[in-house]
């Protein structure tokens, strides 16, 4: 894909507005997974070495208003430690305080501004908001693939006001995902988990046209089981999607894509998540809540993956946050990792809670061919949808 790269830009003594994705999971004030911060470091370091002045912007969570728990101040210490360099935090995105801080920056200095989503104008793609951000800098760099499916002020609108380039994380994501969706190395298996089928209908339809096996987990699998007249007890599923399910099954059948749903499951009884009970799907009781795949399904999926050349994975198979229901997700993760290390499988993982699931399995990015930081962005890419952030950069070449 042809997009302007920061490597083709004179950065010396220029002020660069760098859009990253620091939307990291935090619990009790502690960052639980630094993957997204780590992915931004090569671009930040490159800008420092090029003697640029760097203003970092990001969103964090979905705040309704200003909220200290969702302030980017929470990531400043971790960012400074990882860079081995002091990063200054400003609790605003524009105004006199920000302008004053920017005006005294030296080459190589780094400032982190406050959460963009503290301002409703960000998600509204407000032109004036984008213009105010742009007024701080000489150059804009997008290094947030995971946000590039959003038509937000700091993602697409801002490119109207500044020379705009792609950072290394964004470039890497596009390179690997382009390779993944070329669908050349077959057989291809796709695993799709998660809660709502309506948010994944386009990607499911696309995958049934391209892959040999479509393995379903999470609440999405519950929908297919229920559609097949299997009792799913009190398990979560989405109402009013039977027509969508019918279309997916019909498309899969037409394209010789085998859809794989659980044949056995691990259930909780009466919302007790501390203990799991294994049941065949035909033996699920009214009070059961399906929270993971069972051992026979894990074995079936393992065999399918072992026969595949390419694997695309979006979303966990079970509720892996509870140890009693982590064996499915972690088991499949380890099989995929093992085959990847042996050079037998190209594995592309992204979206859902994939990053957290990889950590839960005691694995890391290096254990797979590529791990995407994108959730919705990963899905949009697989669906073939235009991504506003990427399209905006491409327009700069026209």
Swiss-Prot record:
UniProt subcellular location: Cytoplasm
Gene Ontology annotations of biological process type: gluconeogenesis; glycolytic process
Enzyme Commission number(s) from the entry: 2.7.2.3
Chain's gene name: pgk
Gene Ontology annotations for the cellular component aspect, listed alphabetically: cytosol
Catalysis: reaction(s): (2R)-3-phosphoglycerate + ATP = (2R)-3-phospho-glyceroyl phosphate + ADP
Entry's family note: Belongs to the phosphoglycerate kinase family.
Main localization, broad class: cytoplasm
Annotated substrate binding sites: 21-23, 36, 59-62, 117, 150
Presence of the UniProt keyword Nucleus in the record: no
Alphabetically ordered keywords of this record: ATP-binding, Cytoplasm, Glycolysis, Kinase, Nucleotide-binding, Transferase
Keyword flag Lipid biosynthesis: no
HAMAP family attached to this UniProt entry: Phosphoglyc_kinase
Recorded superkingdom: Bacteria
PROSITE patterns on file: PGLYCERATE_KINASE
Pathway in which this enzyme or protein is active: Carbohydrate degradation; glycolysis; pyruvate from D-glyceraldehyde 3-phosphate: step 2/5
UniProt subunit comment: Monomer.
Name of this chain's protein: Phosphoglycerate kinase
Record: residues binding ATP: 200, 321, 351-354
């Amino acid at each position: 894909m042809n997009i302007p790269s920061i490597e083709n830009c004179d950065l010396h003594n220029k002020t660069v507005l760098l859009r990253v994705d620091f939307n990291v999971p935090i619990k009790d004030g502690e960052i639980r997974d630094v993957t997204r911060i780590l992915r931004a470091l090569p671009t930040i370091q490159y800008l420092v070495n090029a003697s640029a002045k760097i203003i970092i912007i990001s969103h964090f969570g979905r705040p309704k208003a200003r909220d200290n728990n969702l302030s980017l101040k929470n990531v400043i210490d971790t960012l400074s430690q990882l860079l081995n360099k002091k990063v200054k935090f400003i609790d605003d995105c524009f105004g006199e305080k920000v302008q004053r801080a920017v005006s005294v920056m030296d080459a190589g200095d780094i400032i982190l501004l406050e959460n963009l989503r503290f301002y409703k104008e960000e998600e509204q793609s407000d032109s004036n908001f984008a213009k105010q951000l742009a007024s701080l800098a000489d150059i804009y760099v997008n290094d947030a693939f995971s946000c590039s499916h959003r038509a937000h002020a700091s993602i697409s609108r801002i490119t109207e006001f500044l020379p705009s380039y792609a950072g290394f994380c964004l470039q890497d994501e596009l390179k690997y995902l382009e390779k993944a969706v070329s669908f050349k190395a077959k057989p291809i298996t796709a695993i799709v988990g998660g809660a709502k089928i309506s948010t994944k209908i386009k990607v499911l339809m696309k995958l049934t046209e391209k892959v040999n096996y479509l393995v379903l987990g999470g609440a999405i699998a519950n929908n297919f089981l229920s559609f097949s007249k299997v009792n799913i007890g009190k398990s979560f599923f989405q109402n009013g999607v039977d027509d969508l399910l019918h279309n997916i099954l019909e498309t899969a059948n037409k394209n010789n894509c085998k859809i794989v749903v659980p044949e056995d499951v691990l259930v909780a009884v009466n919302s007790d998540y501390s203990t799991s009970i294994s049941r065949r799907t035909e033996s699920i009781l009214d009070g059961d809540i399906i929270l993971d795949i069972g051992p026979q399904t894990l074995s079936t999926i393992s065999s399918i993956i072992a026969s595949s050349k390419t694997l695309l994975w979006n979303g966990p198979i079970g509720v892996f946050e509870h140890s009693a229901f982590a064996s499915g997700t972690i088991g499949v993760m380890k099989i995929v990792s093992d085959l990847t290390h042996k050079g037998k499988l190209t594995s592309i993982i992204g979206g859902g809670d994939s990053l957290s699931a990889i950590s839960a399995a005691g694995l890391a990015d290096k254990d797979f061919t590529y791990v995407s930081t994108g959730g919705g962005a990963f899905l949009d890419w697989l669906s073939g949808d235009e991504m506003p952030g990427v399209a905006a950069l491409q327009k700069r070449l026209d």
